[in-house]
Curated annotation (Swiss-Prot):
Part of the 30S ribosomal subunit. Interacts with proteins S7 and S18. Binds to IF-3. NCBIfam families: PRK05309.1 (NF003698), uS11_bact (TIGR03632). Located on the platform of the 30S subunit, it bridges several disparate RNA helices of the 16S rRNA. Forms part of the Shine-Dalgarno cleft in the 70S ribosome. The lineage of its organism: Bacteria, Pseudomonadati, Bacteroidota, Bacteroidia, Bacteroidales. This is Small ribosomal subunit protein uS11. GO terms for molecular function: rRNA binding; structural constituent of ribosome. PANTHER family: 40S RIBOSOMAL PROTEIN S14/30S RIBOSOMAL PROTEIN S11. Disulfide bonds: none annotated. GO terms for cellular component: ribonucleoprotein complex; ribosome. Belongs to the universal ribosomal protein uS11 family. It comes from the Bacteria. It comes from Azobacteroides pseudotrichonymphae genomovar. CFP2. Keywords: Ribonucleoprotein, Ribosomal protein, RNA-binding, rRNA-binding. GO terms for biological process: translation.
Amino acid sequence: MAKRTVATKKRVVKVDVKGQLHIHSSFNNIIVTITNDEGQVISWSSSGKMGFRSSKKNTPYAAQMAAQDCAKVAYDLGMRKVKAYVKGPGNGRESAIRMVHNVGIEVTEIIDVTPLPHNGCRPPKGRRV
């Protein structure tokens, strides 16, 4: 006898005109997420999702492509203004914000939320090249 499958109801996310843009830029990858004011994810993208591999993932061009992909989906759903929260030391932070603006979403604020240690964990040792 076959098991009965229960159809799960897809969660509906409310899209407002205003929202939040989160850019997480590490040394290896760039992740761009657009949420509504409650923090529910509307669209997301990363440079790895766009097809970039290895060291090409942390380039300003990869950040532009990821931000453009993420912003187009949010723009089509009706988002027009965002606050940008930028986290991390990587490349492509400014170019991602510029690309979101070029898609047609107005960036009202840019806030740097990079965590700074108060002498916490020991950092990785420097490379000898």
